A protein has these predicted regions:
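Structural motif
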Residues: 37-46
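A short beta-strand-loop structural module common to alpha/beta enzyme folds
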Residues: 27-38
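Helix-adjacent hinge/juxtasegments
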Residues: 47-84
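Short, ordered loop/turn segments at secondary-structure junctions
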Residues: 33-34, 66, 107-109
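C-terminal binding/interaction regions
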Residues: 3-5, 9-10, 88-149
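Glycine-rich phosphate/diphosphate-binding loop of Rossmann-like nucleotide-binding domains
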Residues: 3-23
Length: 149
């Protein structure tokens, strides 16, 4: 199950992603927003990320105008490793090497076609582990307030 969230500026992109997920049989829960009326991304962001952290969902897909604000908010939720992506390579390698569990995109930055490609590669790429696991462990240690130096 995937958690989807957006603000008003990412609403239309989220709706296009929902259509694609429906067509491909990927289950999701939409935590809002539910219209193009003004809505602050931190609310839907936190709802979606909480579902990932609790284990109810395996990943979050989050949309706002640029993807930046919603990714900043997502990374404040303990246990979330969010990445703002606008290209295929980053969307793939954020999963492959960084074990990201939230993909953030900007409706004002990329079109629906590219966004769907990024969603597909993000959801279908497994974490490689190995030498990258230590780096993910370091990220999580920083989140806990540990010093790496």
């Amino acid at each position: 199950m995937i958690a989807l969230g957006s603000d008003h500026a990412g609403f239309s992109l989220k709706e296009e992603i929902k259509k694609h997920l429906d067509e491909t049989g990927v289950e999701y829960v939409d935590v809002g927003c539910y219209s193009p009326e003004r809505f602050d991304y931190a609310i839907s962001d936190q709802k979606a990320c909480d579902k990932v952290v609790s284990g109810e969902c395996t990943a979050a897909i989050l949309c706002c105008g640029t993807g930046v604000g919603i990714s900043m908010a997502a990374n404040k939720v303990k246990g979330i490793r969010a990445c703002c992506c606008s290209d295929y390579f980053s969307a793939k390698y954020t999963r492959l090497h960084n074990d990201a569990n939230a993909l953030c995109m900007g409706e004002r930055v990329i079109g629906a076609g590219l966004a769907i490609e990024l969603v597909d590669v993000f959801l279908n790429t497994e974490f490689e582990g190995g030498r990258h696991q230590n780096r993910v462990d370091q990220i999580m240690a920083i989140e806990k307030g540990e010093k790496l130096y």
